[in-house]
């Protein structure tokens, strides 16, 4: 009797474009490569305490419309140039969305937002957009969710995040150990920081794991470890951005033998999922900077051209420049918050 025990729940398997095909079609220009290299170096210097500016990762919760993303990028670039003495501004360019249950998983997974899952098209769109943003002189940041996607886009990322749901995952810690950019680990969804501290230690060490080559072949990868990893406070059961929370995290980092560096996410549980409250967090963090707090090295902000968010399920035409995932602050508040942070950094210098 023949027993069929394999692929019982697999509906379809399609070939994925090898990374090299995309890298050859959309090669990094000298300008884009320079943007990435200089931003990574600047972030490294901030993490080393050799640059007293503030790292600001700001942008849409997720990218669903590349035209709106390009307009946002051009506006942000002007502010980056104006405030570069105080801030290292990097655009949040998130193509993949980890979901607590189900939902749209982002531009790479489902670029046409119709459950057609044209991943090859999604990867093309993502790399092309990243190339255009970096080519303009604006560095980009992203979240890494799997071991394969980085081969298509990681050379154009100046900073990376490992999210709250994946910080505890061994696979993501191994991935971070081999990424060429600095990486932030979020505290756990319950607010605990131990998982992030463990992740920083793990990612700083060498690892050996399975991945794919640029030619799309299965491979054994050995890494040297990533010394540019840090914690991101995103709240949990309650917010954790206050001076008291920062002091507690500093103590935890010191106890673990890690540098006392903290990045604060203004959104997620720190804003209690209310996008306007990001401005309240900004006020508090600015005060901490003005008071001379050196441990705060960076912030994350969810912002778009139009404030709020909209549902993909509503059947209504989509509003240009408005998030389809988490609600974001709009452009007016974006301009305001960046200027506020720059002023706070100036005052921190004394």
Please report, for each region that a protein language model flagged, where it lies by residue.
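Conserved phosphate/anionic-ligand binding catalytic regions in large, soluble enzymes, centered on
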Residues: 55-68, 326
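N- or domain-start disorder-to-order transition segments that initiate the globular core
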Residues: 8-48
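Gly-rich Lys/Arg/Thr-decorated short loops/hinges at beta-loop-alpha junctions or inter-strand turns
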Residues: 18-27, 223-235, 318
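Conserved, mostly hydrophobic/aromatic
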Residues: 59, 264, 330
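Internal helix-turn-beta structural module
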Residues: 304-347
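Active-site-facing alpha/beta catalytic cores
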Residues: 2-6, 86-241, 245-246, 268-269, ...
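Acidic (Asp/Glu)-rich catalytic clusters
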Residues: 47-50, 78-84, 128-137, 222-223, ...
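Glycine-rich loop at the start of a catalytic domain that most often binds anionic cofactors/ligands
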Residues: 66-78, 101-109
């Amino acid at each position: 009797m023949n027993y069929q025990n394999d692929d019982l729940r697999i509906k379809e398997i399609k070939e994925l474009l090898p990374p090299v095909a995309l890298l050859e079609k959309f090669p990094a220009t000298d300008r884009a490569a320079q943007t990435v290299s200089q931003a990574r170096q600047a972030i490294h210097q901030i993490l080393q305490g050799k640059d007293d500016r503030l790292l600001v990762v700001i942008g849409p919760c997720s990218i669903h419309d590349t035209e709106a993303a390009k307009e946002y990028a051009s506006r942000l670039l002007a502010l980056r140039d104006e405030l570069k003495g105080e801030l290292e501004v990097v655009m949040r360019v998130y193509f993949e969305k980890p979901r607590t249950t189900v939902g749209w998983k982002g531009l790479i997974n489902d670029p046409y937002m119709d459950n057609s899952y044209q991943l090859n098209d999604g990867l093309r769109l993502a790399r092309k957009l990243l190339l255009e943003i970096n080519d303009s002189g604006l560095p980009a940041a992203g979240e890494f969710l799997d071991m394969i996607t980085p081969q298509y886009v990681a050379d154009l990322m100046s900073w990376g995040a490992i999210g709250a749901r994946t910080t505890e995952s061994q696979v993501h810690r191994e991935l971070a150990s081999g990424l060429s950019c600095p990486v932030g680990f979020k505290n756990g969804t319950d607010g605990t920081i131990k998982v992030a501290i463990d992740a920083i230690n793990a990612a700083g060490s060498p690892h050996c794991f399975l991945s794919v080559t640029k030619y799309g072949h299965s491979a054994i990868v050995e890494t040297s470890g990533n010394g540019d990893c840090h914690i991101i406070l995103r709240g949990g059961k309650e917010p954790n951005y206050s001076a008291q929370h920062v002091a507690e995290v500093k103590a935890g980092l010191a106890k673990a033998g890690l540098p006392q560096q903290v990045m604060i996410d203004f959104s997620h549980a720190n804003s209690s999922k209310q996008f306007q409250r990001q401005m309240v967090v900004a006020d508090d963090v600015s005060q901490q900077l003005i008071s001379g707090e050196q441990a705060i090295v960076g912030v994350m902000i969810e912002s778009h051209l139009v404030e709020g968010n909209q549902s993909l399920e509503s059947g209504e035409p989509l509003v240009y420049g408005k998030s389809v995932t988490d609600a974001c602050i709009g452009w007016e508040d974006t301009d305001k918050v960046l200027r506020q942070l720059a002023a706070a950094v100036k005052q921190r210098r004394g």
